[in-house]
Amino acid sequence: MALSISGAGAPWWTLPDLELRMTDLCVAYTGRMKAACLVLFLALCALVAEADVAPSSVSGPRPAALDEATAGRFAALALKCLHQEYPNHILHTLTSDADARTPRELTPAFYGCYDWHSDVHAHWLLVRLMRLFPDADFTPVARAAVAQSLTPQNIAGELAYLRRDDRAYFERPYGLAWLLQLCAELRAWDDPQAAQWSNVLKPLESEAATRLENWAGKLRYPIRVGEHDQTAAAFSLVWDWAGVADDPQMRSVLAYAARRFYLADRDCPLSYEPSGEDFYSLCLGEADFMRRVLGPDLFAHWLGGFLPDIPTNPGKPWLEPAIVSDRSDPKLAHTDGLNLSRAWMLEGIADGLPASDHRVAALRAAAQLHRDAALPAVTGEHYEGGHWLAAFAVYLTSGSGLK
């Protein structure tokens, strides 16, 4: 694809001044027409990303693929907590005595693994590993466990819980985004039982997608935190779901959000990270989202302004893994998750650049450092991390979110 603007000497996605080019395109419009113009611009960026990106051949070593033995270890961690009701941390608004009920009664499909969102991504973990390793020893047990959860009755109970007026913001965006990841994994799996589960989940999937789309459309400012509320990390998960679910409207909404929130960002202070309880990086999370929306050349230019200190020399120290001080503390254990998510975000950023970009090797080297620091900690020794870290480990080691 070689789209160019009349009178311009270069394809529009390689022009150095992105904001000026967008002004050239959209300045004549106001109000809704200007918004539509900006949406179109970002949608075209997405088309370039899909059309121009060949299978990745960027420099720097790629990590080893997930093997069946390691997958079995991660599956065991998810199976251990999938239907373990207690201990449980519920985010639940009570309006009367009648609302004081057990987790199993409140959310009958996703009541284990300490909290709702962790149980959702434990289900995602099992579905992804079953899809990747259909003949593994853990697969029959995982099938039975997921089948116990994803029944029409249980999902009807989940939907009834969400649709109460006082729960309009439940698990937004983190838990709802991971629910869409679960739905995407089921959609992508060519398996009769997966198709059945996907069909059972469709009402809940539709509810989650509608809530996230409406929220992203009316959100005035991005949420720049290192925990559950971060918009960029959630948008990445939802963007990938929209591709599998063939939802161009969702992608248009997210592309417009990318333009409003992030396209003009410069000099992200990566040296200020991490905060003490982060499990997401603010800077890397944003870049990992933007590489999905922008084509490789446009993303390469944007990244140069956003993270200008990425070295072109892979031997130069750049980003060290964060240090975990106490894995028995549920908040301090977030740091293991930070190292895991940093690793997949760094790999994603490298994957989003042109094959010849000299920053790729340094990005991959930093990703490997974080991978090596984090994966040995995914043991389940402490339930504070054991109930959720395996999902992050599987997202990383199975290449989720990569081309």
Q: What would you call each of these model-derived segments?
A:
Residues 12-13:
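Tryptophan (W) side chains
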Residues 105-108, 120, 129-242:
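Extended ligand-binding groove/face enriched in aromatic
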Residues 243-388:
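Long, repeat-rich segments with strong aromatic
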Residues 58-66, 76-80, 120-136, 177-193, ...:
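Well-ordered alpha-helical scaffold segments within catalytic/enzyme domains
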Residues 37-46:
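Bacterial N-terminal signal peptides
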Residues 53, 58-111:
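Low-complexity, Ser/Thr/Pro/Gly-enriched N-terminal "stalk/linker" regions
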Residues 63-68, 103-120, 160-176, 218-231, ...:
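Solvent-exposed loop and edge beta-strand segments that line ligand/cofactor-binding
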